[in-house]
Amino acid sequence: MECELLGEETGTFGQALESLKRGHLVTRKGWNGKGMFIFMRPEDCLSTEKVVNHVKSLPESFKKWIANNYGDSEIDKIKFTAYLCMKAADDTVVNGWLASQTDMLANDWVIVE
């Protein structure tokens, strides 16, 4: 198992992933300080009531499907798995960020302080 990144040292994508799992923000020196970094959205388990009535980031068609197939209760739960996000140079957040081959093979990953 690869260790996470420490302090200001640079490391591999594997080390960056370990750091992400521990809640750190990571970036690449090769991204030239454009304010871009990666973070992990942790897994979550939400009641179907909350999903149907309160979550704004899901389409109404999915909420309707949940209501029709699970009901609208505090007891029934939907598990949302963890995924990576990127804070992009234009200050948007990209959900479901995927590393390129270049990113995966790079040795210039660092923790954002």
What would you call each of these model-derived segments?
Residues M1-A89:
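Extended non-catalytic interaction/regulatory regions in multidomain proteins
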